[in-house]
Every structure is written in structure tokens, then in C-alpha cells.
UniProtKB/Swiss-Prot annotation:
Biological processes per GO annotation: protein catabolic process; proteolysis
Region (Disordered): 1-67, 679-749
Segments on the Cytoplasmic face: 1-75, 208-749
Molecular functions (GO terms): ATP binding; ATP hydrolysis activity; ATP-dependent peptidase activity; metalloendopeptidase activity; zinc ion binding
Full protein name: ATP-dependent zinc metalloprotease FtsH 3
NCBIfam families assigned: FtsH_fam (TIGR01241)
Binding partners and assembly: Homohexamer.
Feature: compositional bias, Basic and acidic residues: 1-17, 679-689
Length: 749
């Protein structure tokens, strides 16, 4: 279990998506030439055939560029059509004879000779071609197929008297030419005319495929090659100096570093280093950073690849890439193989999660990984590091001794861890004297390393936009609000909407102030921000690692405060409490079905955990009567809390009205001002005050956010899924299978 992020409930309205900055009107900078100083390296380089990541250079020293046909795919299609059309024209028109009139041998041809209208003939076998002295039309002009021309052709029948024809031609002074019979075009010409265009098209595609193969590292034949990115030990700029806030995980990995540096030290004593290390933890905790730091500290080659990159639509490619990756790592040993998001291919086999029988490509890839890890010799200095956010769904064969037998949980940092992370990320950021990193660490429970890095970056961008020389305390505070809630919106709400929003948020705040064990109220606001029309911030005084029943019931009461306040004051309801209802229902269901906080159910888990579904799809794990009893217990807890909140707000109606008046006047009230406006004494213990009390989002999935609970009226039909930076401990769901904190859904205001 880990610490709580601040919680929030909100009056939701969707913030329009921000437009990306436009480059319109700007003159694009001239790109430096390939050989000019300061020019960036050409990214279109291909890995060397040895797979070691050495770029293959072209003749001019630059990277080999992939060939791009003008016009893309359409250009290629047009080019092919032009070739086919050219072939048809050559065969049909270019070699076709000029226009001639074809006349019968008898009586037309013979009659034209006798009339003296034949000037010259050329005889080729039985074919006669020649020229008339005057135009001849055949067939007659009234025929639609008639042709008029001086050139003619005819065929001499086999039974014709050639001697008589010869005498007739001589008598009429006709010039006679003769040539041997033409048996058609030569074999070479026929081949060129018939297959030339096809051969040309094939040659074009071969040329294009070779160019693309050179640019993509092998083209079609590279499917089975590993696509792992390799970085040498000297190139890795990440070391344990860049890792902070996760000392326990760092200590676990130091032994791996020592083995890679001094393997003889362990082999001499018969020790065997773990073949695989599994890093698990919520997103953003630094699993990938840890793996790179191990490679950087050890100074060995680092092969990194996402598990999803192994699988392609071609069967067998995943297993082939696994073999190639491990082959490269063994050749470069000592080395580290890092597989990110292992659950993409390492999901447990069987159990109804996929095809029953059948040949699943992911299973082939998983089997190949298991085989390769079994094939490591005890002296092979190759360490496999994998990262996953969901270790509970991994196949048991991956986790047995001899494979990923060392498991390192990378948890969300505590307050001291967050302070160390902030120091790492602010090394290159000039901070003003009023920035207190300890206060920031205290005000960000539940945030992980990625969230804190984003916070520092947003603060730096905000300071630059404001023209500050250094990042100030106000920059950090405003950046934290923006990261958690989004930017402020200029929304013109009616007086009635502002008043209803003020009562909704004040209801959350008053219940939080008067409920024992609830998180302190840090800030109340009716200024629209992000997807909220108003928010109430709550956060614990210190990181929480466990939750008692009183605390969880208190969270349910605070979630009901806004809805009950509307009932009391306006006598009707709105859809603005949708996310509140989802959140309190999720807490109550987990109290009954997972945490054993119901005497009627007892210490029995009747809600399936996220990683362990039913054995077969559609098969329930609990009986209908048990499920009905769970629903009854959930209703009992919620109804009891609703009655208590109604009594509390009726008794303190004056405090509620007073806080609403302060909100309508000031719009935003900090912790001290909120208690003063409500007329209640602040009995909370002293705590280190952050630069501005802010909530932290929680992991939308599996953790309880004990932090600020933004209470809210959400906007109409605008669902808003808020993913948290992370929580320090497991968190109850917002619905029957989800968790509290993290899922904030906007309703209809």
C-alpha cells in the first residue's frame, strides 16, 4: 500500500481542447545541408547487417534515403497504366499499315488493271499491294464501311492463272515489284513486343523493393529480425545519479550492476546471478529509467524493445525476433535486454483469456522467450529486465525460478522520495528563493516521478510565458493546479448556477470539516477549471498506508455532501453529482465485497480481483443470493451515511449559508479562509503548508486516493475520465469493479 494523493470532486464541464501552436506566418528556418556544420544527423540510417546498430552510410557519407516515387502510390499506378497504353499503341497502331482500300481480286482489281487505273503493285506471296492512279471507293459509297484511297491491297486466289495476270499487267504498263513471302515479325521482335512491358514493370518493382530494403534494413526479409534499439554503455547518459525516490528498487539492482562489472567475483563462489529481473509498478514510477540506469552504471550494451513489437500479422515472426534479439545480446555479452510492457505477450495462457485451442502468435512468442531464458548458460553475462504495470496477469512460467525470479516492486515515492525526485528534476531549472521543494513534496502525495517531472516542466513553461527570469512559488502553484485540474476557463454562469454550485461545493466542505477522520479541506472554489464548474480540495496531513472503516465511511459522507446540500436548499436534484455517486458506490462495494467490512458478508472476497477473472466467460464466482446480499449491504452503508449527512447539514445550515456567502463573494477560499467563512474552528494538527494547497489525481484504476476529494457538480453529459498521477496505496473503486479516486465522471448540471 502506498500514500494518498489528494482527492477532488468537481462540478464538471468539458474544457475545449487546446489548439496546438500555429506556425502560420512564420518563415521556416533553412535546414542545414548534410555536410554543413551543426547539421543534425540523418535519421534515415539503417542498422548494419551485424545487427549492432551501426548506421550504414551511403556514398556521400549521409544516411541512405528511402526512394520515394513521385506522386506516391497513385504515381506508380499512373506510370504502369502509361506503360500498358504505350505497349498497346505500339502493337496496334505504330506497326499498322497506312489506310488502304481492300478490293476483291475479281472483278474489281482485274477491272482496274484493264481500265489502266493501276500504277504500281508489290507482290509478297499471295498478297498484292499497290497504288491506283485515281481514288477508288470500295465498297460503294452508300455502304457505311466504304473506304476511298489510292493505295489498295488484295489477295490472289490459289487457283488464279498467274500467267494471264502477268500478261495483263504488262499490257497495261503496270510496274511490278516482288519480295519473298513475309512470315511475320522475327522471334526477337515478338518477344520484345509481348514481354517487354511486363519485364519493364517487374524491373521497376525490383528496383523499388531494393531501395526500400536498403532504407528499412532488409525489406521483406527483415521481418524475422529483432527491432531492438541498441545503445552502448558509453552512450548511456542515465545512471543511478538520475534515479531518486526509489531507494529500495535501486538497492536490488545494484547487485545486477556488480555482477555485470565483476562476474568472476560470483562465479568463483558458485553463485548464479538471476537471469531475469521483473520491474513492476504503476505507470510513471521509473521502471524504464531504472533499467537504463543499470546499463549506464555497468557500461554494457543495452537492447530495448517493447513486447508489442515482437508480434506481427505473419505467423512465426514474433518467435524469430526473440531468437534474433537473444542472439545479438549473447554476441555482445555482457549485455542487458530490456522488454517493456511484458504483459502484452506474457499474459497467462488458458483460463478463458483468448482462443480455446488454436495457434496464438503471442503464445509462440512467449514460449520462445521461455526457451531462450532456459538456454542461458550459468556463465552467460546477459540479464533480461522486463517491466509491467500488471504483474498479476503474467503467466506463471515467466515467474518461476530460473526466469524472472527476481521481482522488484517500484512503488510510488513517499514525501522524502518526492523531495529527492524534485531535486533531480530542478537541477537545470533556476528557482526563485521563495520556492520550497519540501512544501511542494508535502502537497503532492500520490504523485510519481513522471508527474513531478511534468509539474516542474509546466512551472518552467509558465514562468517563461510570464517573462520571469526564475521559476517562482506562484508559477509552481499555478502549474500544479493546471496539471491536476486543467487551465481556468472563462465561463459566464448565471446567478442561479453560481449559487447552486456554491451550495454543492459548500456541502462537501462542511461535511469534510465536521466529519471525524475525514481529510482536511484545503481549498474551495467555484471558478470553472478544466472540466469542473467548481472544486473542493482535500488532502491528508501525511502519507497514508492503510485505511480504516471510519476513514472510508467518512469519504462516503463527504461524497454525499454536495447532493444532500442541494436536496436541503433547492428541494430537487441535478445530474451534477454523478461522479460523487460512482465514487461512493465503488468505496461501499469494496468495503463489502473485497475488504470484509460487512458483518453480513464477513471476511469473504465476493468481488473478483482485476487480474483473476472467472475460469470461463459468463460463469459467475458467487451465487445470486450472495450478490443480492452484497447489494443490500452496499445500500445499507450508503443510506446510513446519507441520513447522517442530512442530519449534519440541517443542524449546521447557518454554517453552510455562511460559507456559500463567502464563496459567492470571493469565489475561492483557502483552508483558513474557508473555516473562517463557515464559522467553524479549525481543529486540524499543524502541517507544513504547501505553496498552494492542491489535490493530486489518482491512478484511475487500482488505488485509493486518500487525498483531496474534489466534490462536484458536473456539466451535462460530459464524461471526464481523470487519470491520476498515482497513489501511494490501493484505492477503492468508483463502480462495482473499478476504484475510488481516479474516475471522475461529469453529470448533467
Amino acid at each position: 500500500m502506498t500514500g494518498d494523493p489528494p482527492e477532488r470532486r468537481s462540478n464538471g464541464d468539458r474544457l475545449p481542447a487546446e489548439r496546438p501552436p500555429s506556425n502560420e506566418g512564420q518563415t521556416p528556418p533553412r535546414k542545414p545541408g548534410r555536410n554543413e556544420p551543426g547539421s543534425p544527423p540523418d535519421w534515415r540510417v539503417t542498422p548494419a547487417p551485424d545487427g549492432r546498430g551501426t548506421p550504414r552510410r551511403g556514398r556521400n557519407g549521409g544516411g541512405m534515403r528511402p526512394f520515394r516515387f513521385p506522386g506516391g502510390r497513385w504515381g506508380i499506378l499512373v506510370f504502369i497504366l502509361v506503360l500498358l497504353g504505350l505497349n498497346w499503341w505500339i502493337s496496334s497502331n505504330a506497326l499498322a499499315p497506312s489506310e488502304r482500300v481492300r478490293v476483291p481480286y475479281s472483278p474489281n482489281f482485274i477491272q482496274q488493271v484493264r481500265d489502266g487505273n493501276v500504277k504500281e503493285i508489290s507482290s509478297t506471296g499471295a498478297s498484292i499491294q499497290g497504288d491506283f492512279r485515281a481514288d477508288v471507293t470500295y465498297p460503294p459509297k452508300d455502304d457505311k464501311d466504304s473506304v476511298t484511297a489510292k493505295k489498295f491491297s488484295t489477295e490472289v486466289p490459289a487457283f488464279a492463272d498467274t500467267d494471264e495476270l502477268s500478261k495483263l499487267l504488262q499490257d497495261n504498263d503496270v510496274t511490278v515489284n516482288a519480295s519473298p513471302a513475309d512470315n511475320g515479325p522475327s522471334l526477337l521482335v515478338s518477344i520484345l513486343l509481348g514481354f517487354g512491358p511486363v519485364i519493364l514493370i517487374i524491373a521497376l518493382f525490383v528496383f523499388l523493393s531494393r531501395r526500400m530494403a536498403g532504407a528499412a534494413g532488409g525489406g521483406m526479409m527483415s521481418f524475422g529480425r529483432s527491432r531492438a534499439r541498441r545503445s552502448e554503455g558509453g552512450e548511456a547518459q542515465v545512471t543511478f545519479r538520475d534515479v531518486a525516490g526509489i531507494d529500495e528498487a535501486e538497492a536490488e539492482l545494484n547487485e545486477i550492476v556488480d555482477f555485470l562489472k565483476n562476474p568472476q567475483k560470483y562465479q568463483r563462489l558458485g553463485g548464479k546471478i538471476p537471469k531475469g529481473v521483473l520491474l513492476s509498478g504503476q505507470p510513471g514510477t521509473g521502471k524504464t529509467l531504472l533499467a537504463r540506469a543499470v546499463a549506464g552504471e555497468a557500461g554494457v550494451p543495452f537492447f530495448s524493445m517493447s513486447a508489442s513489437e515482437f508480434v506481427e500479422m505473419i505467423v512465426g515472426v514474433g518467435a524469430s525476433r526473440v531468437r534474433d534479439l537473444f542472439r545479438q545480446a549473447k554476441e555482445a555479452a555482457p549485455a542487458i535486454i530490456f522488454i517493456d510492457e511484458l504483459d502484452a505477450i506474457g499474459r497467462a495462457r488458458g483460463g478463458g483469456r483468448g482462443s480455446f485451442g488454436g495457434n496464438d502468435e503471442r503464445e509462440q512468442t512467449l514460449n520462445q522467450i521461455l526457451t531462450e531464458m532456459d538456454g542461458f548458460e550459468p556463465t552467460t553475462a546477459v540479464i533480461v529486465i522486463a517491466a509491467t504495470n500488471r504483474p498479476e496477469i503474467l503467466d506463471a512460467a515467466l515467474l518461476r525460478p530460473g526466469r524472472f525470479d527476481r521481482r522488484v516492486t517500484v512503488a510510488a515515492p513517499d514525501r522524502n522520495g518526492r523531495l529527492m525526485i524534485l531535486k533531480v528534476h530542478t537541477r537545470s531549472v533556476p528557482l526563485a528563493d521563495d520556492v520550497d521543494l519540501e512544501s511542494i513534496a508535502s502537497s503532492t502525495p500520490g504523485m510519481v516521478g513522471a508527474d513531478l517531472a511534468n509539474l516542474v516542466n509546466e512551472a518552467a513553461l509558465l514562468a517563461a510565458r510570464r517573462g520571469h527570469v526564475k521559476v517562482t512559488n506562484s508559477d509552481v502553484a499555478d502549474a500544479l493546479e493546471k496539471v491536476v485540474l486543467g487551465a481556468e476557463r472563462k465561463v459566464m454562469m448565471s446567478d442561479d448556477d453560481r449559487r447552486r454550485t456554491a451550495y454543492h461545493e459548500s456541502g462537501h466542505a462542511i461535511v469534510g470539516m465536521l466529519t471525524a477522520g475525514a481529510d482536511p479541506v484545503r481549498k474551495v472554489s467555484i471558478i470553472p477549471r478544466g472540466q469542473a464548474l467548481g472544486v473542493t480540495f482535500s488532502s491528508p496531513d501525511a502519507d497514508k498506508y492503510n485505511y480504516d472503516e471510519r476513514y472510508l465511511v467518512g469519504k462516503i459522507k463527504v461524497a454525499l455532501g454536495g447532493r444532500v446540500a442541494e436536496e436541503i436548499v433547492f428541494g430537487d436534484l441535478t445530474t451534477g453529482a454523478e461522479s460523487d455517486i460512482q465514487q461512493l458506490t465503488g468505496i461501499a462495494r469494496q468495503m463489502v465485497g473485497r475488504w470484509g467490512m460487512s458483518r453480513a458478508i464477513g471476511p469473504i472476497a465476493v468481488l473478483p480481483s482485476e487480474g483473476n477473472g472467472p475460469l470461463l466467460p459468463g460463469v459467475a464466482e458467487t451465487s445470486e443470493s450472495t450478490q443480492r446480499l452484497v447489494d443490500e449491504e452496499v445500500r445499507r452503508i450508503v443510506d446510513s451515511a446519507h441520513a447522517e449527512v442530512t442530519r449534519l447539514l440541517r443542524e449546521h445550515r447557518a454554517n453552510l449559508d455562511s460559507l456559500v456567502a463567502g464563496l459567492l463573494d470571493q469565489e475561492t477560499l483557502d483552508e483558513a479562509d474557508a473555516y473562517e467563512a463557515a464559522g467553524l474552528e479549525h481543529m486540524r494538527p499543524e502541517r507544513v503548508e504547501p505553496p498552494a494547497p492542491r489535490p493530486s489525481r489518482r491512478d484511475g484504476g487500482r488505488s485509493v486516493a486518500a487525498g483531496p476529494v474534489p466534490h462536484g457538480l458536473e456539466a451535462p453529459e460530459r464524461p471526464a475520465q481523470i487519470a491520476a498521477p498515482g497513489a501511494d496505496e490501493p484505492e477503492p473503486p468508483t463502480n462495482g469493479s473499478g476504484e475510488l479516486g481516479g474516475s471522475v465522471r461529469a453529470g448533467d448540471a
